[in-house]
């Protein structure tokens, strides 16, 4: 077997803000290293999910191995690990970054440094990586590469003269990037003879071969026939195949050694056995310590998912199980609702993650779903001294037992052109944000960095859309969790015809509860079909009704058959109708149609503007 020379390996990642051209740049690198023939080339080659290509974003980390003959005449092996750019997938990025020695930090020459660029930059710094700044999209008419290079130096402290100007579209500067990877990024360290120590940075599920973990080997080697052990669970498996990634797919090899990036098949059936971020070692010669700094991904946003047709409950469970195989961050547990029947309470990393999971369930598994309003995890301190977590607003304990309710807060970093600062500050004030810092950036563009602290629940719903509309799309944001703080929060129940509809219950700040409740009852009154009796729709905090709307009754024209004639006859018919309605009202049940839930999700969450 040919030993890989470690000094000829370069492991690197590309990090960027959404839309700064990361995937296009990866495409050019594949082309220039002749890894992909022109015939096979397609846009966003590494984004394998149909949804990724359609939305133009990278959701899962993906790896590829290419060979490059450098100007010094030597042939190098590059392992490129592509990372997601969206803030929801920060944990995926941190794992991908742990598997490499250097990163290309891609910044759009027309946009400059954005909020997520900064967040990813700090992660790469924490790992102690070599960072090569790449100013991309220099072919754009409004590109200002020199200014952006100076901004990178000012904001991130990376010397402007080290920046490489490139265009993923035309291919200009890409050769220079490849040379910089060889020159600046250090080769991996590691001893192939030491006990095996491999980091799992991603995994995919294959119907025939089970779970295929993606590995970066730090020490030792692994080959078919080896007995491996998963560090955190202690489970053991026998390796069937090992191999590397090529752009055309997975290719089996004889062995994987320290410094390499690859995959293995070992008939692993359960995704929970190989948690991403876990360490893999040999059963008979385990490594003394696992790879540090990993935690299981923890969901921060919860929503109920229910099948429109209750007969598809089993199908939904199987679909969620399958998605979880590729998505360690997704959690779900069964829940039932009087209004929606049986479904699941699902946990996500953020709103985009929730949206993508729902879209994949509908697309790949052909399900029709209803999602309840997303909510954050509240902590409740009870008078008895214990603390409970509340994932579903309907589960909030009785107010008489509650000492205080704590809500999660986030630190927001926002980059915006100067002229939008006023309207953004107004938006953040409305969202109960508190200004921590404000920093004017150098350059002719006059951009400002705003740092705020705000309740997570406030920025969960429509904040991103409103941030974009207030700033005409120029502002960008990134957030991180900063812990829990007490808040003046109340649970609002929505009653239709005197019955609480659990799926519409929400937790809100006391000051905002009234406006949100008003919007919800008005919207419900529009979408609930009229009955033969009038239907009151109310919102209540405890026993106090704070908003009400009424669906007016339908009336049959009982006088149609009376021509002229005696007025007492007409009165008798009308009285009879009234009596009948009274009886109906007492025993009548109102079905809340599915559209009503969807309508409320859009209504109740957009607070009235103005």
Swiss-Prot record:
Record has Nucleotide-binding as a keyword: yes
Gene Ontology biological-process annotations: positive regulation of translation
Gene3D superfamilies: 3.30.70.240, Elongation factor 4, C-terminal domain (3.30.70.2570), Elongation Factor G (Translational Gtpase), domain 3 (3.30.70.870), P-loop containing nucleotide triphosphate hydrolases (3.40.50.300), Translation factors (2.40.30.10)
Residues given in the record as GTP binding sites: 19-24, 136-139
Catalysed conversion reaction: GTP + H2O = GDP + phosphate + H(+)
Swiss-Prot/TrEMBL keywords: Cell inner membrane, Cell membrane, GTP-binding, Hydrolase, Membrane, Nucleotide-binding, Protein biosynthesis
Function: Required for accurate and efficient protein synthesis under certain stress conditions. May act as a fidelity factor of the translation reaction, by catalyzing a one-codon backward translocation of tRNAs on improperly translocated ribosomes. Back-translocation proceeds from a post-translocation (POST) complex to a pre-translocation (PRE) complex, thus giving elongation factor G a second chance to translocate the tRNAs correctly. Binds to ribosomes in a GTP-dependent manner.
Protein name in UniProt: Elongation factor 4
Origin species: Thermus thermophilus (strain ATCC BAA-163 / DSM 7039 / HB27)
Database matches in SUPFAM superfamilies: EF-G C-terminal domain-like, P-loop containing nucleoside triphosphate hydrolases, Translation proteins
NCBIfam families: lepA (TIGR01393), small_GTP (TIGR00231)
């Amino acid at each position: 077997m040919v030993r890989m020379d470690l000094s000829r390996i370069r492991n690197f990642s590309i990090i960027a803000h959404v839309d700064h051209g990361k995937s296009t740049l990866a495409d050019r690198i594949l082309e220039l290293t002749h890894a992909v023939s022109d015939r096979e080339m397609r846009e966003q080659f590494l984004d394998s999910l149909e949804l990724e290509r359609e939305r133009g974003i990278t959701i899962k980390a993906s790896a590829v191995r290419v060979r490059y003959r450098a100007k010094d005449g030597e042939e190098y092996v590059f392992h490129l690990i592509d990372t997601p750019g969206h803030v929801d997938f920060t944990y995926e990025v941190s794992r991908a970054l742990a598997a490499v020695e250097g990163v290309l930090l891609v910044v759009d020459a027309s946009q400059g440094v954005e909020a997520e660029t900064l967040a990813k930059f700090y992660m790469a710094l924490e790992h102690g990586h070599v960072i090569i700044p790449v100013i991309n999209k220099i072919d754009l008419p409004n590109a200002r590469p020199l200014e952006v290079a100076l901004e990178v130096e000012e904001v991130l402290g990376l010397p402007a003269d080290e920046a490489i100007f490139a265009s993923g579209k035309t291919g200009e500067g890409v050769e220079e990037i490849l040379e910089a990877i060889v020159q600046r990024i250090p080769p991996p360290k590691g001893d192939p003879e030491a006990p095996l120590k491999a980091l799992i940075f991603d995994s995919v599920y294959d119907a025939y071969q089970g779970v295929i973990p993606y590995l970066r080997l730090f020490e030792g080697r692994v080959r078919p026939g080896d007995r491996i052990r998963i560090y955190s669970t202690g489970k053991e498996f026998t390796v069937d195949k090992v191999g590397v990634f090529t752009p055309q797919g997975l290719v089996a090899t004889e062995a994987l050694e320290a410094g390499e990036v690859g995959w293995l098949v070992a008939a692993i059936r359960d995704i929970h056995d190989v948690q991403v971020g876990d360490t893999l070692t040999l059963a008979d010669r385990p490594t003394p310590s696992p790879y540090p700094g990993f935690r299981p991904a923890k969901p921060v946003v919860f929503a109920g998912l229910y099948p429109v047709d209750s007969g598809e409950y089993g199908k939904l469970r199987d679909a969620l199980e399958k998605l979880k195989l590729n998505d360690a961050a997704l959690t779900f547990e069964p829940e039932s609702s009087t209004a929606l029947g049986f479904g699941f309470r699902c946990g996500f990393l953020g709103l985009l993650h929730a949206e993508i999971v729902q879209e994949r369930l509908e697309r790949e598994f052909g399900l029709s779903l209803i999602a309840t309003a997303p909510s954050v995890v509240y902590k409740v301190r009870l008078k008895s001294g214990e603390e409970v977590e509340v994932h579903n607003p309907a589960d909030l304990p009785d107010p008489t037992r509650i000492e205080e309710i704590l809500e999660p807060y986030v630190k927001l970093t926002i980059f915006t052109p100067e002229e939008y600062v006023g309207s953004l500050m107004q938006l953040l004030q409305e969202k109960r944000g508190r200004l921590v810092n404000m920093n004017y950036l150098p350059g002719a563009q006059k951009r400002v960095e705003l740092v705020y602290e705000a309740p997570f629940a406030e920025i969960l719903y429509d904040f991103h859309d409103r941030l974009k509309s207030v700033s005409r799309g120029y502002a960008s944001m990134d957030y991180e969790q900063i812990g829990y703080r007490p808040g003046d929060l109340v649970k609002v129940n929505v009653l239709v015809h005197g019955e609480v509809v659990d799926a519409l219950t929400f937790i809100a700040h006391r000051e905002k509860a009234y406006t949100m409740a008003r919007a919800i009852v008005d919207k419900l009154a529009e979408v609930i079909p009229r009955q033969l009796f009038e239907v009151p729709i109310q919102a209540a905090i405890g026993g106090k009704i704070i908003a009400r709307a009424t669906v007016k009754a339908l009336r049959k024209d009982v006088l149609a058959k009376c021509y002229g004639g005696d007025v007492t006859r007409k009165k008798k018919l009308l009285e009879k109708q009234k009596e009948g309605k009274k009886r109906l009202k007492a025993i009548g049940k109102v079905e809340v149609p599915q559209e009503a839930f969807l309508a409320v999700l859009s209504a109740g969450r957009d607070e009235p503007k103005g």
